[in-house]
Curated annotation (Swiss-Prot):
Changing residue 159 to A: Disruption of interaction with dhp1/Rat1. This is Decapping nuclease din1. It comes from the Eukaryota. Keywords: Hydrolase, Metal-binding, mRNA processing, Nuclease, Nucleotide-binding, Nucleus, Phosphoprotein, RNA-binding.
Length: 352
């Protein structure tokens, strides 16, 4: 079985209703990939010194991330352990939905994900089994620049609880990407209910008291927000990025900002902080953006046929509905691949 979905076959439409992403659980991963059912690896933002050298510590203090992606069963296990029932169409990683949403921006990109409907819950679970990243010159060092920027922009505790040494010695610490804090959110996009998990780089101030997990699932299995006792922490979270700086007239810069927006939008992250660097990896400028302001900031630069945030959301809504309806035509536990090999189409194949 093979089915295709073309971005350009999606008719113009109003933007689908999208709910605010609500955190329903979180977890941490140690540098040894031990699963911790808490927020112990949540980092706190603290501005790095300008003109920091992002090469410092490479490669001697760099502990590269493990090569294989995490299975989505980790997230399922966290929710089950915490007693949070899942009432959704999809359970997957934020990054994979970002790939689907932003595929029209990358007509030369290639990736593949795996899907299966859980026979018990009926949820479509989606994951990567191998990393599908395009290689390029100087890749290891440039990836390190991003990890290093995160390391020198964060503290293990809120700043007034840290020692002077912890603040001033950030440039000398090991860079360990496998140590992570992850947020699990529920979000509705059109008729599709999703539970998404994604890494959070840091928090702007202090994590507010979120809903007790015992308060967010009802007798009928749906997840509910207890608004009287909870504040959604996701608006306090920060996404950290590094980039060369180009004017917004540059299509590549607009495309990059659209991806930053999509990635943070899907997890409900409130701020994006970009460290602009030169060709040698020197941090030359910092820019703080509120996620919701990026579409408005880009609007004057869009041309008639450009992929705008609204247009990407319409395509995502249709793609999710297409995946749901196609998978439901087959028995539960049937496995599929969803692939993109460039151009204008997603391809869904049944694994025989």
């Amino acid at each position: 079985m093979l089915r295709e979905f073309s971005f350009y076959d999606v008719p113009p439409a109003h933007v689908p209703p999208v709910s605010e992403p609500l955190e329903i659980a979180c977890y941490s991963l140690s540098r040894d990939r031990e699963l911790l059912l808490d927020d112990s690896k949540l980092s706190y933002y603290y501005p790095p010194p300008l003109f920091s050298d992002l090469n410092t510590g490479f490669p001697n203090r760099f502990h590269p991330p493990k090569s294989d992606p995490d299975p989505i069963s980790i997230v399922k296990d966290v929710l089950m352990t915490k007693g949070i029932q899942m009432n959704s169409s999809f359970l997957t990683w934020r990054g994979l939905i970002t790939k689907i949403m932003c595929a029209p921006l990358d007509p030369r990109n290639h990736w593949e994900t795996y899907l299966v409907m859980d026979p018990t819950s009926g949820i479509i679970m989606m994951e990567e089994r191998t990393r599908s990243e395009t290689s390029y010159a100087n890749q290891d060092r440039m990836c390190y620049w991003g990890y290093k920027f995160e390391a020198i922009s964060t503290l293990p505790e809120i700043w007034d609880a840290c020692s002077r040494d912890q603040i001033e010695q950030r440039d000398n610490q090991d860079v360990v990407p496998d140590e992570q804090y992850c947020s699990i959110v529920k979000i509705n996009i059109g008729k599709s209910k999703l539970i998404l998990a994604g890494e959070v780089d840091c928090i702007w101030d202090k994590k507010p008291c979120s809903a007790k997990e015992s308060d967010v699932h009802s007798d009928d299995g749906t997840i509910e927000e207890d608004a009287s006792n909870a504040e959604n922490p996701n608006l306090h979270y920060v996404e950290l990025k590094t980039s060369k700086k180009y004017p917004l007239e540059n299509y590549g810069m607009r495309k990059k900002l659209l991806k930053y927006w999509a990635q943070s939008f899907l997890l409900g992250i409130g701020r994006i902080i970009i460290g602009f660097r030169d060709d040698n990896g020197i941090l030359i400028e910092m820019k703080e953006l509120f996620t919701h302001q990026i579409p408005k900031m880009l609007r004057p630069y869009f041309k008639p046929n450009d992929w705008t945030p609204n247009r990407l959301l319409v395509v995502l809504e249709h793609a999710l509905e297409w995946i749901k309806q196609t998978v439901k035509q087959h028995p539960p536990s049937t496995e599929f691949t969803l692939s993109y090999t460039g151009g204008s189409k997603l391809v869904l194949r049944q694994i025989i």
